[in-house]
Amino acid sequence: AKVGGIHANNTYPAEFIYENLMIQTNIIHNAFLNGVKKLLFLGSSCIYPKYANQPIKEDELLTGKLEPTNEPYAVSKIAGIKMCESYNRQYGKSHNIDYRCIMPTSLYGQGDNYHSENSHVIPALIRRFHEGKINNASSVSIWGSGKPKRDFLYVDDLASSAIHVLNLEKKIYDKHTTQMNSHINVGSGVEITIKKLAESIKEVVGYKGQINFDLKKLEGSPRKLVDNQRLNSLGWKAKIKLKEGLTKTYNDFIINKCLV
């Protein structure tokens, strides 16, 4: 998938909707044509309305307007869910296919894109605080007020959840989903404000300066915490705490010299 933070989504909307639609359409359809019986589509919690009820249950999908800054990306991901559901409905029995969908919340971890503007919030802040530290900068700027709340999921937990969901017996998966609402949320279950997140990253990196909040910049949805009850009832919970995940991610940044 083509992914990025608020700046990238807002700056390159055509690329985000076109590339994601093309990627998933080609993969899902060609998987079907080539006899792939089981497939897992990864969506995003961006699929839900900007002002969805919190924590966000799976049935909040298509109940309201999306966050404008990432609407093209969200629409492409919604299309991917509906494509999987449609193929299941039309070809599930005749071709014995089982295409499933999970919706992870904000991801982070090793191998991320650490671009200071086009990446997601955690890798972007890791880079900004690191550069602030080595340059002895008096302050580091953060987009928005710092008040929005997010749920962050470490990449290893995502991988674990993907394997767990894919390995579920079909009758069990079907029991917890419906034909027209077949996706499953994946999150840590813990929310944190962007302000507190920035303070945590500052501590992990070892930056000693101040944090400035740029109120002129975009900050997205005010709150985005997914409800994990469906996945928890299927026997899975996230294991990696935020502080541990941030430390591992910063170590990855340092080891791989991700200054591009």
Which residue ranges define each predicted feature?
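Glycine-rich, phosphate-binding/catalytic loops in enzymes
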Residues: P13-F16, P55-D59, N118-H120, A159, ...
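Hydrophobic alpha-helix immediately C-terminal to the catalytic Tyr-X-X-X-Lys motif of short-chain
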Residues: A79, M83-Y87, V121-L125, L197
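Short, solvent-exposed loop/turn segments at secondary-structure boundaries
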Residues: D112-E117, L153
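C-terminal substrate-binding subdomain of Rossmann-fold SDR/epimerase-dehydratase oxidoreductases
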Residues: L125, E131-V260
